[in-house]
């Protein structure tokens, strides 16, 4: 995993909490994601911005990421377990791991292979539906490591 500068965090995530979430969701997180959260639960990064192609416009767009965490002392709005779909607006096999300042979601996309341990990273618009009435999903990176390589400080 490449070096990521963390501005602040909520301590270290507990391995048992990560494993319990994986079992409950029927997924396996990428190893580099696990390493990051085991070192920095709910990290806020010094360079949190990334660029992607907005499927609704075809234009490059910039968003930021604030990671959810696993700690029981975190507020519900910062806990990964409380951030998962509860109203049926998300596609199956999408696991949200972060949010953007505007309310969009950064997620692992397991739709191609629910058993993958290196899923794609996507951005899900919270206020823009696709043709099925689900939140529109935009591919950001083919893996978590590639996603980390896209992170930069906004100009």
Regions found by a protein language model. Name each.
Residues 1-104, 152-155:
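A surface-exposed partner-binding patch
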Residues 108-136:
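Segments surrounding the PLD/"HKD" phosphodiesterase catalytic module and close analogs
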Residues 131-149, 153:
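Glycine-rich, aromatic-bearing surface loops/beta-hairpins
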């Amino acid at each position: 995993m490449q070096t990521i500068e963390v501005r602040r965090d909520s301590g270290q995530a507990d391995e048992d909490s990560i494993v319990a979430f994986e079992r409950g969701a029927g997924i396996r997180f990428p190893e580099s994601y696990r390493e990051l959260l085991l070192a920095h639960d709910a990290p806020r990064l010094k360079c949190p911005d990334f660029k992607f192609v907005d499927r609704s416009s075809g234009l490059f767009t910039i968003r930021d990421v604030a990671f959810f965490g696993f700690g029981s002392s975190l507020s519900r709005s910062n806990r990964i377990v409380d951030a998962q779909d509860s109203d049926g607006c998300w596609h199956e096999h999408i696991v949200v791991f972060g949010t953007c300042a505007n309310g969009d979601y950064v997620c692992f996309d397991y739709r191609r292979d629910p058993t993958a341990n290196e899923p794609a990273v996507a951005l899900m618009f919270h206020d823009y539906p696709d043709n099925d009435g689900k939140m529109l999903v935009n591919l950001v990176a083919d893996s978590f490591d590639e996603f980390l390589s896209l992170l930069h400080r906004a100009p």
